[in-house]
Amino acid sequence: MKVAVASRNPNKVRAVEEAYRLFGIPARVSSVDKPPSLPPQPVGLEAVVAGAVERAKAALAAAGEAEHGVGIEAGALEAGGRHLDVTVAAVADRGGLVTLGFGPAFQIPDVFLGDVLRGVELGVLAERHFGKAAVGYREGIIGLLTRGRVTRLDLNVVAVAMALVPRLPANAQLYRFWKTAP
């Protein structure tokens, strides 16, 4: 299966490869540019989901041979009076079906929160604070906060895997859209 991901970030490309492999789905993953209209730091659950969906549809449109387009978006949401960083993945197909998955979320450090809510990318803030370049292309802020025990790749893989769950053949009877999905 040919799969396109709307990101040039090797971390996201690898996450898509690993998620498909997890379910035994042979996939050749290519990367395309993300849509230019996306904000650097989406705030609010609907904005994060919309970003993932927009990326997935853009990937499918940009890679004419792809059967699936994948979008991975991380952003801030409020829950329980706290602000969390969550990763959302969307998988779109040529039949128009879009499925969603979420990765684990973690509480955004207080020292970054004000800037994040103003739209500054969390990865940029982490780079400045920790003095490391290209954090989002490597371990992510979660990797820095957990001293490498949990990485951005881990969050991305889980999000994409969860977006694939409704598409697994074993789940065909559980989802109403299955008969119309390729």
From Swiss-Prot:
Its EC number is 3.6.1.73
Which superkingdom, per the lineage?
Archaea
* UniProt: Mg(2+) binding residues: 65
In its UniProt record, a GO molecular function of this protein is:
metal ion binding
Which keywords does UniProt give here? Hydrolase, Magnesium, Manganese, Metal-binding, Nucleotide metabolism, Nucleotide-binding
BP terms from Gene Ontology: nucleotide metabolic process; thiamine metabolic process
Q: Which residues does the annotation say bind substrate? A: 65-66
Cofactor(s) required for function per UniProt: Mg(2+); Mn(2+)
Q: What class of enzyme is it?
A: hydrolase
> How are cofactors bound according to the entry's free-text note?
Binds 1 divalent metal cation per subunit; can use either Mg(2+) or Mn(2+).
Catalyzes what? Answer: XTP + H2O = XDP + phosphate + H(+); ITP + H2O = IDP + phosphate + H(+)
Q: Kindly state the subunit structure of this protein.
A: Homodimer.
Q: What does this protein do?
A: Phosphatase that hydrolyzes non-canonical purine nucleotides such as XTP and ITP to their respective diphosphate derivatives. Probably excludes non-canonical purines from DNA/RNA precursor pool, thus preventing their incorporation into DNA/RNA and avoiding chromosomal lesions.
Family membership = Belongs to the YjjX NTPase family.
Tell me the protein's name: Probable inosine/xanthosine triphosphatase
Q: Please report the organism this UniProt entry assigns to the protein.
A: Pyrobaculum neutrophilum (strain DSM 2338 / JCM 9278 / NBRC 100436 / V24Sta)
The organism's lineage is: Archaea, Thermoproteota, Thermoprotei, Thermoproteales, Thermoproteaceae
